[in-house]
Amino acid sequence: MVTIANAHDELIHDAVLDYYGKRLATCSSDKTIKIFEVEGTENYQLTETLVGHEGPVWQVAWAHPKFGSILASCSYDGKVLVWKESPDRSWSIISEHKVHQASVNSVSWAPHELGAVLLCTSSDGRVSVVDFNDDGTSTHIIFEAHKIGVNSASWAPVDTKSPVRRFVTGGSDNLAKVWSLDASKSTYVEEAKLEGHTDWVRDVCWSPSALVRSYIATASQDRTVLIWHQDGEGKWQKQKLTEELFPDVCWRCSWSFSGNILAVSGGDNKVSLWKENLQGKWESAGEVDQ
């Protein structure tokens, strides 16, 4: 584990490596985003500080490199900013998305096969999906997803046979919901409502690989993580990651690239790793003290 000292002046909310693992973007309550060059396993060199938000920055997301060196950020200020690196290695804002009326809590780029598409969730209860066109213009769809606030969202992996836009959202109504695009109505429709938590759903994560079975993980303030999969009839079934409650709130969950390991971070400042055994039960695969 590598510690980067004095990266920000206040609490860091997110840290994400780019596609190649060569750069790290971090964001903080100090309203800034910082870009680090990664050299080897322990050398992180600060190369840029991005200033543009007027409140705490909750999350950052790198676009696929086919679209260039592009980073999206979201903030308590209700804005989503899209940043691009120019050939001289300077960064600038190329798009500002201001359709939400409250904090924007998460941003997530769609699988690159679907184009340059950004998914945003907000405390105003709505989700917006922004399509960025080759000519520099953009269009968006916005709709209500969870009345008292949306905390997170995650795209489904692309089915090459039927590349439908699908994603899952997690809300302050204790629910997760699965959505898909209805192109005829130019909006997203609710496919399924995933009920199982007794407090806010803080994070959702759709496994990136559907080679064997597609999973959704939901992490909640109720100190549980649920794993969801569709049965033969297409109905979503849930399974507790562990029968015991986590020591504190479960803030984030994240699948490995191959989708066979799940990482869970909680209010106890620990990251636990989980994997499915041959009997279909989830078991501990280790723990990291932060």
UniProtKB/Swiss-Prot annotation:
Keywords: Cytoplasmic vesicle, Endoplasmic reticulum, ER-Golgi transport, Membrane, mRNA transport, Nuclear pore complex, Nucleus, Protein transport, Repeat, Translocation, Transport, WD repeat. It is found in: Cytoplasmic vesicle, COPII-coated vesicle membrane; Endoplasmic reticulum membrane; Nucleus, Nuclear pore complex. SUPFAM superfamilies: WD40 repeat-like (SSF50978). GO terms for cellular component: COPII vesicle coat; endoplasmic reticulum membrane; GATOR2 complex; nuclear pore outer ring. Pfam families: WD40. It comes from the Eukaryota. GO terms for molecular function: structural molecule activity. Belongs to the WD repeat SEC13 family. The COPII coat is composed of at least 5 proteins: the SEC23/24 complex, the SEC13/31 complex, and the protein SAR1. Component of the nuclear pore complex (NPC). NPC constitutes the exclusive means of nucleocytoplasmic transport. NPCs allow the passive diffusion of ions and small molecules and the active, nuclear transport receptor-mediated bidirectional transport of macromolecules such as proteins, RNAs, ribonucleoparticles (RNPs), and ribosomal subunits across the nuclear envelope. Due to its 8-fold rotational symmetry, all subunits are present with 8 copies or multiples thereof. This is Protein transport protein SEC13. It comes from Meyerozyma guilliermondii (strain ATCC 6260 / CBS 566 / DSM 6381 / JCM 1539 / NBRC 10279 / NRRL Y-324).
